[in-house]
């Protein structure tokens, strides 16, 4: 009877040593402080997955980026700083020298002001290290007024910052 109990104890101690899948939920607010939805972030094998549940946004294509500071002071959200860029690269997926870690693909808001969908960023993490969205106290997620052109430095001509949420543990 001791062997099964010891085996169970060993299994439980190994399971306790394995970290739970990292995830966090971010609430986004507009420039007036009104909640416009949430984004769930979770660790993937390579990078971070995002599930968008947004509402009350202008219809059309919008840029979304991770920004370097865990601040979202309205009305312009400039307190979030520039794009999260620990690798020190230029902006845009079409840049031959690489892109910011915080650059992501555009997403579409429907005619009713809603956006529900998945995105990913393979150049960030929810773990430890320089690419962690939790480094230096966290980061911010910014939704921009326009689409990212994926090439123009520093932000892809993506327009004003219209929604912001702080990413922390």
Regions found by a protein language model. Give the residues of each.
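Bacterial N-terminal signal peptides that target proteins for export
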Residues: 1-7
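N-terminal leader/targeting pre-sequences
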Residues: 6, 18-61, 66-169
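Bacterial N-terminal signal peptides
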Residues: 7-15
């Amino acid at each position: 009877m001791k062997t099964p109990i010891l085996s169970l104890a060993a299994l439980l101690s190994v399971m306790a040593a394995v970290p739970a899948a990292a995830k966090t939920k971010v609430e986004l607010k507009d420039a007036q402080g009104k909640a416009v939805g949430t984004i769930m972030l979770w660790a993937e094998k390579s990078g971070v997955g995002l599930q968008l549940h947004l509402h009350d946004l202008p219809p059309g294509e919008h840029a979304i980026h991770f920004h370097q500071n865990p601040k979202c002071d309205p009305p312009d959200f400039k307190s979030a700083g520039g794009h999260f860029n620990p690798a020190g690269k230029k902006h845009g997926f079409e840049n031959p020298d690489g892109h910011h870690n915080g650059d992501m693909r555009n997403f579409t808001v429907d005619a009713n002001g809603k956006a529900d969908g998945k995105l990913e960023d393979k150049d960030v993490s929810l773990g430890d290290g320089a690419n962690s969205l939790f480094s230096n106290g966290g980061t911010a997620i910014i939704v921009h007024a326009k689409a990212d052109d994926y090439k123009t430095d520093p932000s892809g001509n993506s327009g004003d910052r219209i929604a912001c949420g702080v990413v922390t543990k």
